[in-house]
């Protein structure tokens, strides 16, 4: 099995993270951030939140006993699904494999990102068709979506 970093699209792997003035001058006490149009008066919502959610990831990492850089925090599953396509799949070239029926966002995100989604029907009793899932995958398959418990059937795999 290849390391996860090798599966990331090269242009994504080499991206520099977005940097704000707060990142660059974070060690200094600065009350006014004119570049961000933030208020210096603390009312609970006067600052933009940390886009990396570093403090929360560190707290979760300590609680779960894993490294903070192994934790993803997003705005729900739709964002995570979309980002998986964007990170791992080359538009117009790669594909993903999924069961059917399942959560509809896998299809929406595939279409949005120009990635072929190969849907494999569940068995008549909603069982997981493992051999057909494996047969649907090829060297261009970058994602396999298994929703458990499945939406909309409710069965767990």
Language model feature labels by segment:
Residues 87-109, 123:
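Conserved PLP-anchoring active-site segment centered on the Schiff-base-forming lysine
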Residues 57-95, 113:
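Phosphate-binding glycine-rich loop
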Residues 42-44, 81-82, 106-107, 153-154:
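Glycine/Thr-rich phosphate-binding loops of Rossmann-like dinucleotide-binding domains
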Residues 37-40, 77, 103, 149-152:
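Short glycine-rich anion-binding loops that position phosphate/pyrophosphate groups of nucleotides
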Residues 124-157:
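Active-site phosphate-binding strand-loop segment of PLP-dependent enzymes
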């Amino acid at each position: 099995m290849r390391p996860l970093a090798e599966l990331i699209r090269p242009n994504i792997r080499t991206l520099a993270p977005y940097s704000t003035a707060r990142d660059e001058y974070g060690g200094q006490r600065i009350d006014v951030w004119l570049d961000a149009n933030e208020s210096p008066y603390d009312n609970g919502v006067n600052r933009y939140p940390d886009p990396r959610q570093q403090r929360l990831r560190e707290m979760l990492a300590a609680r779960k006993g894993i490294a903070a850089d192994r934790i993803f925090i997003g705005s729900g599953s739709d964002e995570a699904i979309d980002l998986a396509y964007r990170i791992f799949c080359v538009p117009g070239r790669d594909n993903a494999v999924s069961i059917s029926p399942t959560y509809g966002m896998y299809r929406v995100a595939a279409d949005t990102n120009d990635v072929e989604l190969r849907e494999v029907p569940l068995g008549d009793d909603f069982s997981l068709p493992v051999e057909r899932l494996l047969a649907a995958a090829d060297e261009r398959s970058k994602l396999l979506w298994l929703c458990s418990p499945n939406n909309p059937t409710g069965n767990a795999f």
